[in-house]
Amino acid sequence: MGKIIGIDLGTTNSCVAVMEGGEAVVISNAEGNRTTPSVVAFKGEERQVGEVAKRQAITNPNTIQSIKRHMGTSHTVDVDGKKFTPQEISAIILQKLKKDAEDYLGESVTEAVITVPAYFNDAERQATKDAGKIAGLDVKRIINEPTAAALAYGLDKGEDHTILIYDLGGGTFDVSILELGDGVFEVVATAGDNRLGGDDFDQKVIDYLVAEFKKENGIDLGKDKMALQRLKDAAEKAKKDLSGVTSAHISLPFITAGEAGPLHLEMTLTRAKFEELTADLVERTMEPTRRALKDAGLTPSDLDKIILVGGSTRIPAVQKAIHDFTKKEPFKGVNPDEVVALGAAIQGGVLAGDVKDVVLLDVTPLSLGIETMGGVMTKLIDRNTTIPTSKSQVFSTAADNQPAVDIHVLQGERPMAPDNKTLGRFQLTDIPPAPRGVPQIEVKFDIDANGIVHVSAKDLGTNKEQSITIQSSSGIDEAEIERMVKEAEANAEADNKRKEEAELRNETDQLVFATDKAIKDLGEQVEEADKEKAEAAKEKAKTALEGSDLEAIRTAKDELSAVVQELTQKVYAKMAEQQGAEGAEPQAEAKQDDNVVDAEFEDLDDRK
């Protein structure tokens, strides 16, 4: 059985880890970094992922960032007339992480544990699983990010702990409360906001810069796409800088042009101003934190440790807010960017049998139920119920001789059905005619360990049953996923072919250059016939490089290589002959001298 890798598929950055020798280790990517930007760019037929895609985002409109915010929705991205779902874009990122893991391990990787925000609903979880499948990964488990962080933090802790995990990433926020003891990781409560993260802090800075520039120059940079991308990069950098210093200078020369010529943006952002701009965002994280504690029936004094996860927790105001609320210093012993991937790798180790004596008890983040008479949401499974779990309840018909019942499956906390998230609908038909309230319809909810929901309805009178596994609301069916899998594989092959072509062209180009240099350097030592032969082979290679026939390039390269080799061998043989002829006389003299020296040595030897 191969390794099960752990993947933190983040909004702004992603990370991959694996268990090695009983330890979870982060795998560096091909560029040598431990995290990979969750950015995908399309340039003609080529797909770029990570740092290389992020770097050219300013000039390439076909660059997609923060796609995780759209997981589980019907949102699509248009690239040159072709539509991509969030699952397909996420799959491209996952393919890159899979390839980096394979290069590191030296073996094929087909299985993974992928993390999601604890507050992801069923559609978002299913979409994440589909993305894995499209990328060629069998997703063995979907686990919550805070739970993964607790695994990475608490695997070697023997004593009982109650910990609060505060996870503020690039696009999502979660808070979870866990109890750790004897290898059992039990999630007691979870809360969060899937539309809050580091991107929102960046946006506050961007809005401020745009407003200040407009005040000064009368030009709205918010309408200039290229300027906005430069502002985004500058805002992100300033935010990071302000975690370590009290003021950051933002300098963007030639940001736009006015009537008098080019205009530059020069501004200093202080930490105090940044905290003023983002105070409402920090406060938005505290409401779910208070709710999670309340759901767990705990007070801040009951907490043993506070663990901060996600790059945005480096913001001093965030650390101060959590410290002021809990009256505890957050634990700094884990890398907030890597801890989730490490935890996912540990869960992979548990599933593979490499990690023993660890039990993970996660919870469902939102209540589940069905719509009943009057548009009411009737809950069957309450939020923060430990999963996997199963619950059933008996319902009846609302009208006489009702032949069928519609089962409207919902997820959320609101009392009325329309205010909650629809997970799916299905129908139980062929109910025998009977007065209202007589038929007995048993509705059963099952939630598996991935947090994915299965619902069935059964007429207890006839034993007729109908069931549904909730698909993501984006409505991608199995056939569509299979098509995407094949497309992703084809693109991976195309990427490899492009890489091979680039390498072949580079090698041929270098050989042409080396041939030119060799002919010049050797000069008169090359016979005219050999020179002409080499020139002809070189021109053939140059002509082949101008075309698109790879086989022709390969053939021309091989021919040129053989000609150059033959030419250099001839020259070196000729040079060796010349040196042999020139060195014959001095050699004879040396021999005479040698005899004298030998005689001396013999005398010395005789004396010994």
From Swiss-Prot:
Gene3D superfamilies: 1.20.1270.10, 3.30.420.40, Actin, Chain A, domain 4, Substrate Binding Domain Of DNAk, Chain A, domain 1. The modification Phosphothreonine is found at residue 172. Residues 595-608 have a biased composition (Acidic residues). SUPFAM superfamilies: Actin-like ATPase domain (SSF53067), Heat shock protein 70kD (HSP70), C-terminal subdomain (SSF100934), Heat shock protein 70kD (HSP70), peptide-binding domain (SSF100920). CDD domains: ASKHA_NBD_HSP70_DnaK-like. Pfam families: HSP70. Residues 490-508 have a biased composition (Basic and acidic residues). Residues 576-587 have a biased composition (Low complexity). Signal peptide: none annotated. Keywords: ATP-binding, Chaperone, Nucleotide-binding, Phosphoprotein, Stress response. Residues 490-509, 576-608 are annotated as: Disordered. One of its GO terms (molecular function) is unfolded protein binding. Induction: By stress conditions e.g. heat shock. It comes from the Bacteria. PANTHER family: HEAT SHOCK PROTEIN 70KDA (PTHR19375). Acts as a chaperone. Belongs to the heat shock protein 70 family. This is Chaperone protein DnaK. It comes from Exiguobacterium sp. (strain ATCC BAA-1283 / AT1b). The gene is dnaK.
